[in-house]
């Protein structure tokens, strides 16, 4: 494996033996240069419009040339997941590490991680029982774009005690913290590596650390460990070497066998099989073809040493777990808990001051090497990424990759295909067009509109703006969506989509910061009260009596785009609202707990808007009709800052925006009556004759 050779830190050597150091260094320099010269394709640039024009000077003739930059999200349907290495790659690259000639533990930086952004935090990976340091191999490329990654390699023959490993990691942490004191340091530990991370954090409560613990070892299962230790003790010392020689002879001399395994592995790859089964068979074949590597990785004496390390590390962590002050993210597999107890994880989550537990229900003991686990996405979804002292939802936000957007499209496919959204916008001359052409390309822009029940309108609108115009809406959302409550009534994973797509907790300060950054901001003044309205309240606005956004918009000269949406009454009917649930004791208790957990951001407001009860409305689905969106003509505030400082003037503009939102809704309610394709059957017949990807007509404008 090619690596970046790191300078020696506190006695730690680079991950290369003396015989191959020059070769690795040469390869590293070449590959690192190549990586830095290529722009990453997995994280698109910050968008501002569908088509951007950049001008550059020609040194020869000083001519100005316009270059058109395509929307990176325009072909989202064709997006594919980032190429990730597999278990077979892990075993292939582990072969080089197992045969590295021994030596002390040392740090290395994979060359896939050579293109990180500026001011990226440091990530130190602490390996599990294998000790290779390659446990993040499937995640190197994606994590390497947002972190400066160092991985700890512990050679097979190394017998460094746990307390010395902790000191070694601690010295590196202190050295890097001294060098860049404002940069957070992430410790990612797997099983026994998680114990080392907790030990380091407990010994250094004043250093800015973030811990990501993957299936942390919390107890030794004597039912499994004692028989294993006894069996290893009675095995002859030469048995691993004998097995290694047998495997080596079989695979070195039997080229046809090796070729057959490679051919089968390629034949049943995920690309050909298109599912988990193919990948699983590929991994089984990969293990079969790399048994010599496994025998070298876990010889008898090394396994016995690792078991002793495990016992000591767990005892050490449990003795001072109360000293840990770092924020912690625990990733807990749903299967194969042979080194942890869920009771211990519950104790950790209560003991550690800032702890998030994320369950990976479908994964086993080594989730970072399994399909379906993307550590970078998990970090985004838990708001665990930061470049400073605390997470900033605006400056620390990472744009979704094209594949992450495609996942959102796939997740909402039924809603989008079932409702065939019609989106209208208004040009500067007042002409209404069926497209998003009338929306401003450059920010700051504030979109103000009506919230459907449960926010059904959000996904089609946000996705359409990104794919058609490359406009990324930063939605202002209720803070409850960003809370990681362990005893919540709902699975907090259902809120991941809001964090991936750029949601921000609503506050005056966040509106200010977003508009200052010239963002496209989505605001629902009606908030929770509108999104969880009661029977008969469809299309009714629950807005504050006084202006809350006009003056901050005028401060930055933001355009205000009023919009309305209709269609919720064509897809469902509310049969059990908050008034009904309040009369049912069980549902009443659940509603009160949900409201308490969420908190009321308008506490003290005696108007109807302050009555923010959190509940899940009982809905009866209908044969889906159609969603209609109407974006009104943008309202200019540039140059009006002084004028709008006057409360009465600001209130006039506020009422104008509210009136235009109501007019947009009324316009759509009337016009949809003349849409021949409002109902599902005519739309299906149209697409059956014109193609399933064809745009379905609507009413005349």
Swiss-Prot record:
Record region (Disordered): 37-64
InterPro entries membership: AB_hydrolase_fold, DAGAT
Pfam families from the UniProt entry: DAGAT (PF03982)
GO CC term (a single one): chloroplast
Keyword Mitochondrion (UniProt): no
Transit peptide feature, positions: 1-65
Cellular localization per UniProt: Plastid, Chloroplast, Plastoglobule
Reactions listed under catalytic activity: a 1,2-diacyl-3-O-(beta-D-galactosyl)-sn-glycerol + a 1,2-diacylglycerol = an acyl-3-O-(beta-D-galactosyl)-sn-glycerol + a triacylglycerol; a 1,2-diacylglycerol + a fatty acyl-CoA = a triacylglycerol + CoA; a fatty acyl-[ACP] + a 1,2-diacylglycerol = a triacylglycerol + holo-[ACP]; phytol + a fatty acyl-CoA = a fatty acid phytyl ester + CoA
Keywords assigned: Acyltransferase, Chloroplast, Plastid, Stress response, Transferase, Transit peptide
Its EC number(s): 2.3.1.-
Observed effect of gene inactivation: Plants lacking both PES1 and PES2 grow normally but show reduced phytyl ester and triacylglycerol accumulation.
GO molecular function: diacylglycerol O-acyltransferase activity
A biological process from GO: phytol metabolic process
Induction text: Accumulates upon nitrogen deprivation.
SUPFAM superfamilies in alphabetical order: alpha/beta-Hydrolases
Recorded family membership: Belongs to the diacylglycerol acyltransferase family.
Biological role stated in the UniProt entry: Acyltransferase involved in fatty acid phytyl ester synthesis in chloroplasts, a process required for the maintenance of the photosynthetic membrane integrity during abiotic stress and senescence. Exhibits phytyl ester synthesis and diacylglycerol acyltransferase activities with broad substrate specificities, and can employ acyl-CoAs, acyl carrier proteins, and galactolipids as acyl donors.
PANTHER family with a match to the protein in the record: ESTERASE_LIPASE_THIOESTERASE FAMILY PROTEIN-RELATED (PTHR22753:SF43), TRANSMEMBRANE PROTEIN 68 (PTHR22753)
Protein's recorded name: Phytyl ester synthase 2, chloroplastic
Naturally occurring in which organism (per UniProt): Arabidopsis thaliana
Gene label: PES2
């Amino acid at each position: 494996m090619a690596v970046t050779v790191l300078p020696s830190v506190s006695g730690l050597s680079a991950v290369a033996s003396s015989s191959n150091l020059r070769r690795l260094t040469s390869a590293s320099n070449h590959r690192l240069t190549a990586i830095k010269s290529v722009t990453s394709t997995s994280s698109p640039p910050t968008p501002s419009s569908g088509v951007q024009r950049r001008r550059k000077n020609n040194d020869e003739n000083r001519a100005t040339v316009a270059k058109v930059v395509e929307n990176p999200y325009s072909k989202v349907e064709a997006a594919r997941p980032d190429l990730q290495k597999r278990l077979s790659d892990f075993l292939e690259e582990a072969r080089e590490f197992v045969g590295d000639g021994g030596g002390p533990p040392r740090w290395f930086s994979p060359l896939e991680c050579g293109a990180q952004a500026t001011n990226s935090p440091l990530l130190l990976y602490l390996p599990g029982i294998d000790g290779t340091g390659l446990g993040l191999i499937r995640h190197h490329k994606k994590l390497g774009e947002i972190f400066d990654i160092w991985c700890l390699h512990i050679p097979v023959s190394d017998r460094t005690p746990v307390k010395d490993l902790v000191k070694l990691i601690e010295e590196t942490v202190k050295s890097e913290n001294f060098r860049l004191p404002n940069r957070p340091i992430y410790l990612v530990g797997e099983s026994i590596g998680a114990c080392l991370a907790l030990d380091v954090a407990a010994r250094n409560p004043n250093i800015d650390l973030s811990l990501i613990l993957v299936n942390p070892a919390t107890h030794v299962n004597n039912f499994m460990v004692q028989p294993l230790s006894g069996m290893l003790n009675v095995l002859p010392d030469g048995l691993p070497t004998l097995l290694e020689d047998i495997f080596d002879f079989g695979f070195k001399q039997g080229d046809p066998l090796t070729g057959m395994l490679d051919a089968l592995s390629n034949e049943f790859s995920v690309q050909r099989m298109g599912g988990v089964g193919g990948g699983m068979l590929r991994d089984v074949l990969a293990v079969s073809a790399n048994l010599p590597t496994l025998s070298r990785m876990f010889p008898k004496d090394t396994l016995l040493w690792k078991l002793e390390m495990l016992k000591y590390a767990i005892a050490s962590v449990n003795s001072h777990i109360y000293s840990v002050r770092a924020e912690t993210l625990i990733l807990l597999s749903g299967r194969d808990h042979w080194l942890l107890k869920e009771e211990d994880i519950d104790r950790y989550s209560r003991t550690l001051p800032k702890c998030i537990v994320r369950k990976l229900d479908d994964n086993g003991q080594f989730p970072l090497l399994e399909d379906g686990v993307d550590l970078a996405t998990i970090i985004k979804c838990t708001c665990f990424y930061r470049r400073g002292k605390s997470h900033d939802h605006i400056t620390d936000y990472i744009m979704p990759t094209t594949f992450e957007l495609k996942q959102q499209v796939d997740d909402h496919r039924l809603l989008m295909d079932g409702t065939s959204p019609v989106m209208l916008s208004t040009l500067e001359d007042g002409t209404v067009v069926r497209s998003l052409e009338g929306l401003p390309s450059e920010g700051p822009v504030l979109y103000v509109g009506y919230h459907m029940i449960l926010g059904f309108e959000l996904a089609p609108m946000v996705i359409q703006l990104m794919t058609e115009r490359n406009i990324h809406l930063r939605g202002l959302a209720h803070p409850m969506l960003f809370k990681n409550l362990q005893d919540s009534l709902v699975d907090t994973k259902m809120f991941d989509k809001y964090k991936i797509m750029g949601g921000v907790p609503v506050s005056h300060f966040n509106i200010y910061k977003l508009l200052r950054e010239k963002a496209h901001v989505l605001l629902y003044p009606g908030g929770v009260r509108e999104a969880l309205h009661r029977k008969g309240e469809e299309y009714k606005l629950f807005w504050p009596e006084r202006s809350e956004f006009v003056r901050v918009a005028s401060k930055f000269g933001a355009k205000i785009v009023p919009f309305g949406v209709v269609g919720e009454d064509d897809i469902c009917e509310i049969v059990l609202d908050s008034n009904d649930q309040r009369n049912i004791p069980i549902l009443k208790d659940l509603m009160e707990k949900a409201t308490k957990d969420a908190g009321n951001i308008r506490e003290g407001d005696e108007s109807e808007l302050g009555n923010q009860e959190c509940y899940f409305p009982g809905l009866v689905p209908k044969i889906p009709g159609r969603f209609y969106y109407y974006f009104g003509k943008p309202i200019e505030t540039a140059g009006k800052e002084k004028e709008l400082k006057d409360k009465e003037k600001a209130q006039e503009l506020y009422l104008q925006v509210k009136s235009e939102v109501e007019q947009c809704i009324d316009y759509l309610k009337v016009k949809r009556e003349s849409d021949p394709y409002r109902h599902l059957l005519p739309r299906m017949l149209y697409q059956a004759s014109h193609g399933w990807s064809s745009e379905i007509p609507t009413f005349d404008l």
